[in-house]
Amino acid sequence: MVKAILLDIEGTIAPLSFVKEVMFPYSKKKLREFLEKNWEKPEIKKIVQEVEKIEGRELSLEEAVQLFSRWIDEDRKITPLKELQGHIWEEGFKSGELKAPLYEDAYEKIKEWKEKGIPVYIYSSGSVKAQNLFFGHSVYGDIRNLFSGFFDTKIGSKRERSSYEKIAKEIGLPPHEILFISDNPEELKAAKEAGMKVIQSVREGVEPSGDFEKITSFRELEI
């Protein structure tokens, strides 16, 4: 029996296109201006120092701009990049330049689960900070109260079984009582290996996999 739901964001409850076509280009467009303005701030210095450790060299502002810009183009799942993007997106969401779209069927179903007392968690490669911004400034307003918790790559890669085992521990349930929904077959495979129930969300632009149960809308879910 499913006692908790774990959800991916992009391609599952929000269009893939928003992140790729709106959020990523926004973070790249604002990158230089943001770093120039905030280069001396402790939280930004800390992010740059993490990158310097990865690169094994010190970075000038110009080099940091070039490197982050390249990583955005390559869609690299690197924690300091995600944290920096989180800061940039924060400005965008708070100014009203960015508003997070959600599939209506997903929003309605998450509300229904909340009313039934079924906890819903998010696991995304975007930082927890970015997730809070996303759900705090959605087209339906601030809906963070619909979720019981947020996980990002600090707990581990979404393609590793151990990440899902750790999440189950954090949630406080055995994996077989948690349902994970994602568009990504590799993530679903890792979650299944950890013992979770899994369903593939097949939205526009998503390639269906033959290995998993599928839905095209959250209205198909009966929990």
UniProtKB/Swiss-Prot annotation:
A GO BP annotation: L-methionine salvage from methylthioadenosine
Disulphide bridges: none
Swiss-Prot/TrEMBL catalytic activity: 5-methylsulfanyl-2,3-dioxopentyl phosphate + H2O = 1,2-dihydroxy-5-(methylsulfanyl)pent-1-en-3-one + phosphate
EC number per UniProt: 3.1.3.77
Any Pfam family the entry gives: Hydrolase
Cofactor(s) required, per the database record: Mg(2+)
Cofactor remark from the record: Binds 1 Mg(2+) ion per subunit.
Keyword flag Ribonucleoprotein: no
Pathway: Amino-acid biosynthesis; L-methionine biosynthesis via salvage pathway; L-methionine from S-methyl-5-thio-alpha-D-ribose 1-phosphate: step 3/6; Amino-acid biosynthesis; L-methionine biosynthesis via salvage pathway; L-methionine from S-methyl-5-thio-alpha-D-ribose 1-phosphate: step 4/6
Gene Ontology terms for molecular function: 2,3-diketo-5-methylthiopentyl-1-phosphate enolase activity; 2-hydroxy-3-keto-5-methylthiopentenyl-1-phosphate phosphatase activity; acireductone synthase activity; magnesium ion binding
Protein task: Bifunctional enzyme that catalyzes the enolization of 2,3-diketo-5-methylthiopentyl-1-phosphate (DK-MTP-1-P) into the intermediate 2-hydroxy-3-keto-5-methylthiopentenyl-1-phosphate (HK-MTPenyl-1-P), which is then dephosphorylated to form the acireductone 1,2-dihydroxy-3-keto-5-methylthiopentene (DHK-MTPene).
Oligomer status and interactors: Monomer.
Record's protein name: Enolase-phosphatase E1
